[in-house]
Amino acid sequence: MKGGKMDKLKPIIAIISLQFGYAGMYIITMVSFKHGMNHWILATYRHVVATIVIAPFALILERKIRPKMTWPLFLRILALGFLEPLLDQNLYYIGMKATSATYSSAFVNALPAITFIMAVIFRIETVNLKKTRSLAKVIGTAITVGGAMVMTLYKGPAIELFKTAHSSLHGGSSGTSSETTDQNWVTGTLAVMGSITTWAGFFILQSFTLKKYPAELSLVMWICAMGTVLNTIASLIMVRDVSAWKVGMDSGTLAAVYSGVVCSGMAYYIQSIVIRERGPVFTTSFSPMCMIITAFLGVLVLAEKIHLGSIIGAIFIVFGLYSVVWGKAKDEVISVEEKIGMQELPITNTSTKVEGGGITSEVNEGVTNNTQV
């Protein structure tokens, strides 16, 4: 029983761990942008690092189980590299620069809802509002997104949970938010919305691709390699300054290495496994937790204050996530019960014998013997 419970907890622990990784990436990436890092170059180096890290494991560990590459598979992998490494990441970076990190991160929390809608359209998820489990997934998704929006749109009074010695150093940081009012919010909003939509599409296409190419490490290697090629081409077109490619011991290099190893290599692999086992909706349902983790890391590391809106939103997110996970768990229970029921159906072997002037039908494994004279 312990092993069974642990198997159910592993995907949850893995996805929650990824949220810590993403929170760290947001902080490091913002620092690198402030020091002049170009987002096209960052996306390119990020996938160079990810490919180098993942390739040895994929080539060695999956050499016997790796499916043969075909043109349809190659085109799917090319589309995956186009959707997430190129479009999603660069659109998000553009949106974050045009608006603000807080504003753009709020839209990330729409990812579970968009993924759920796409999953229903492509019949990966089924919805029957007469069933409690389906209703729980729909309501839970709405509550999760709503809670994340509350954290962003309703600030409320500051609540100082931890008294820090560095509080006074960050007292003037609140004025920085006013700087974003002069920026192009329309362009930024459209860019972030496009980013989240392509990310959701990536999860859906990945779930289909895994059915044809069930070698997670190899798939991640191919996605990262495609991301490297596509981002390199885009960078050569969009970035004219050769010095932007310069690599040094700075925040830009740290951002590329960290995001490449943690948020591309490890994240793609973990997400592939969880998607195969629990589906794309379950995988994306935990993304709003990144905002909560970032808020608490901000308190501990940057001596920031948590506001009432953040606490209220966090409570909503927890309830929403519980509702979605409960609905998915019920789906799995129903699926297992149906499989067991199919296996337990009686198999009847009917033999027919001709005896004299009549026909005798005998059911060996069943309950009845019928004789026709």
UniProtKB/Swiss-Prot annotation:
Q: Which residues cross the membrane?
A: 11-31, 41-61, 67-87, 102-122, 139-159, 185-205, 219-239, 255-275, 281-301, 306-326
Q: How does it sit in the membrane?
A: Multi-pass membrane protein
Molecular function, one GO term? transmembrane transporter activity
Subcellular location as annotated: Membrane
* tRNA processing recorded as keyword: no
* Domain EamA span(s) in chain numbering: 23-151, 198-325
Question: Which Pfam families does this chain map to?
Answer: EamA (PF00892)
Q: What is its main location?
A: membrane
GO cellular component, alphabetical, reads: membrane
Keyword terms: Membrane, Repeat, Transmembrane, Transmembrane helix
Recorded family membership:
Belongs to the drug/metabolite transporter (DMT) superfamily. Plant drug/metabolite exporter (P-DME) (TC 2.A.7.4) family.
Q: What is this protein called?
A: WAT1-related protein At4g08300
Source organism phylogeny = Eukaryota, Viridiplantae, Streptophyta, Embryophyta, Tracheophyta
